[in-house]
Amino acid sequence: MQYHVNGALVPEDEATVSVLDRGFMYGDAAFETLRVYGGDPFEWGAHRERLQHTAETLGFGDAVPEDLRKRVDETLAANDLADAYCKVSVSRGVQPGKLTPDPEVDPTVVVITKSLPRGGPDGERVWDDPAEVQTVRTRRIPSDALPADIKSHNYLNGILGRLELQRSAGDGDPADECLVRDIDGNVAEGATSNVFFVSEAGLRTPSADLDLLPGVTRDIVLELAREEGFPVETGAYSLDDVRNADEAFLTNSTWEIRPIGTVDGIEVGTGPMTKLLQRLYDERVERRHY
């Protein structure tokens, strides 16, 4: 494999970043994870826009290179990848070892790709089964403390949630995803996913006004549902709202749409709306990339 590091393609075992890089020292970096279908990054514009938003929030908006898409394409071509996982990172770069950043930024820009076959109607999903989801004590960091709508290299909030799953499982298999609440007790999101559920009133998902990261896949699902005329609501929901749902699923770029099998041991499962949204999502990918 070859990775793109600071404008050059390098072999995987030679791809390095300085120990003085602020992304390594402080998590002072922005990133995006996306899927590639048929050699073309899915929803590139939305991912590029969010990467820019994160960088601007962190104070180095000018550091995102204009030729970033070209670097992604070069990395895919160098590894002969058509269907792939891609991660793009932009850090503030190497600066003196102090917390206050220098205004002059020489960014570190890294593009990583690896094979990730498409699921779709005729393939196999990256997940094996519907997700087992478990509520954790870890709460979502309030946006007043750390903006929830950015993707920085500081991912400790999600890591702590996943660690809870491991510790609570003991010698058994941990749940696939944690269900994280905000400090007011509202359901927010998973460690790396957004949460949807279906009730008699229609499709529901926590509002972007809460402390959560509104994912690119989340936006697509909301768009597809509205195009189909489904009743859609975003709001503040309790754990019982999700536990008692008729259907529930998770979304992110890697999983796409993954049904939830259980929440805290309570069976929820998939259903007609989840299956239809999966099909509509697959059809959009097919139309745009194949």
Regions found by a protein language model. Give the residues of each.
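Active-site pocket-lining segments that scaffold enzyme catalytic pockets across diverse folds
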Residues: 66-122
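Helix-start/capping segments and mature chain N-termini
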Residues: 1-60, 100-290
